[in-house]
Amino acid sequence: MNQNLLVTKRDGSTERINLDKIHRVLDWAAEGLHNVSISQVELRSHIQFYDGIKTSDIHETIIKAAADLISRDAPDYQYLAARLAIFHLRKKAYGQFEPPALYDHVVKMVEMGKYDNHLLEDYTEEEFKQMDTFIDHDRDMTFSYAAVKQLEGKYLVQNRVTGEIYESAQFLYILVAACLFSNYPRETRLQYVKRFYDAVSTFKISLPTPIMSGVRTPTRQFSSCVLIECGDSLDSINATSSAIVKYVSQRAGIGINAGRIRALGSPIRGGEAFHTGCIPFYKHFQTAVKSCSQGGVRGGAATLFYPMWHLEVESLLVLKNNRGVEGNRVRHMDYGVQINKLMYTRLLKGEDITLFSPSDVPGLYDAFFADQEEFERLYTKYEKDDSIRKQRVKAVELFSLMMQERASTGRIYIQNVDHCNTHSPFDPAIAPVRQSNLCLEIALPTKPLNDVNDENGEIALSTLSAFNLGEINSLDELEELAILAVRALDALLDYQDYPIPAAKRGAMGRRTLGIGVINFAYYLAKHGKRYSDGSANNLTHKTFEAIQYYLLKASNELAKEQGACPWFNETTYAKGILPIDTYKKDLDAIANEPLHYDWEALRESIKTHGLRNSTLSALMPSETSSQISNATNGIEPPRGYVSIKASKDGILRQVVPDYEHLHDAYELLWEMPGNDGYLQLVGIMQKFIDQSISANTNYDPSRFPSGKVPMQQLLKDLLTAYKFGVKTLYYQNTRDGAEDAQDDLVPSIQDDGCESGACKI
């Protein structure tokens, strides 16, 4: 190696390269790690040095050299690369490795306009000094490389134009805690700040992207997902697209319910004009969604919902595929098809489904969600009424078209609207659930707006976070984590701004939360359980019972302190009905685990004191945030032991947690013989979860005789999901062979899904 190379320092001066210095930094970064070779990293990086190289480029070269060595056999390179990257990050942010005092840092950032000046109004210098004693900057060293790159790319406060970074991770965590608990009484709030900081900085609670990147800055919109319902008038359609633009510009993903829009050829103003149908308006929504990237963090994304019995359904199901022409395709949104028991019954009996325009059949659209018996009565009545425009189609043909499009695009989602309303925290007669969100885990009431400032409409917001099951050693720990997650997210509802009155009204009235889980695959591996063989069923029952019980208990305690949410009377909880009362009883055949908690005492306490939050749980995908915690994604099985995530900051390799000890215990996605075991687990989770679950179906064509997945199998899995009370189905993944060779040259590549995911956490 040429010792005479000149390097250019950060201040512009030059000096001879100091290889000893590089060696010392590598030595420091490798301390306590297994099976990492410093000389390997040095060799790989030295060949890339050149005369006049900047010290920052030297640093980046070394980091990259270490990251390239991450593999199944040497997973600890992900920590070596991470420590080097943290060193580099802190140099960039602070000009030195040691972070400054918290108070000095906050003063400087507020002066620069990077942090919210409320921080200095809410807390004294003394309190900041106390918070400084809570911080453990060494926790930075527990990040994996993928986590540091995600922090750098998405979460740390920065100038996205120049690439300057202004903070490191522990300041992010303590200041999120400080902002969220700023309105708590002076005497208790620092204790909450410390407890919450400890839970998030040790990865026990995972926070969603909008909270991580936004809380502490002057932008105060942190809902991950927004649900907007559209009426069947031009005013409502325009109000919907205005609301979409407002929220997409503020980092949110969108769920649109466009199911009320009348069909092509319907009369307008008593026949004065001829309706252009749904597609032009869907295009209008697509343009609104794509008009802004999500606050510089993600591209806009939306899922649009419509009922299976809509007169135009055959044209709507194909909107995403690659055939057709620009005029009859709207490819840059995803779609959710809404189904209920009557549709499935027609399929099973080999009968027809009759398609209508919602505008021609009074009361039918509302009954589809609010009252299943009334829906069936009206539906059969309208089928017999010859004066109503309609079209009959064989149920099997319609379901097959839907499943074919789901298989080919992967992005046609399913919402079982009857399950969403019969096993719901809301009374469907007063507050029916008529749609879901971008990633299908949210199920909340909405009402169409007539204009963007309409006070009577309701936009639903989902405020998310998750428990990291991999970091939990006993279910008792969930009690404290539930208290912290519920209190922090509930405080967030008051802390954030609402760009649209209809959103503020719903958020303040219902105070809905969606707390989920990450690292479920690691949790199963640790307990020696598998997805596919039923061995995890009872453990899953016990775990999700504990999660929902402790969340309800925390919200009930908060209601005693701060009052129940104003619209508590619209929930089924107000009538003393709990998830354990309304679940699909078919689940009893696959999980015989008894209930372990005192639900009856909780029921009485909820009837007496109410709940602070109308909903508490939802199981969301978590591609990005689980990388921060070095966890597996949500409830999903991993595709490979090493995953490669393509993010805008390059290729990130991540090894599943504790691979060295547990590699035989993990069940990989494509090792599962089918979807049955997974769908059973989702059904068991849904017994307790009050909103919904982003559940995927997965198919490996090579497992079938002709190398093609038979339609019969797709329909069977759809019916299995319905049977076990599954409310929603998200992606359909088909194995294509390229992504899963498990040598380290071709690890599984995963994109960040849903346009880099928004109601993912």
Regions found by a protein language model. Name each.
Residues M1-Q3, S13, V36-I174, A178, ...:
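Core nucleic-acid recognition elements
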Residues A199, A482-K504, M508, R530-S622, ...:
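Internal maturation/activation junctions in enzymes
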Residues T124-Q150, L440-T446, L489-D494, A591-H596, ...:
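Catalytic alpha/beta core of large soluble enzyme barrels
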Residues R44, I63-A65, Y79-F87, A199, ...:
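A glycine-rich phosphate-binding loop feature that marks nucleotide/adenosyl-phosphate handling sites
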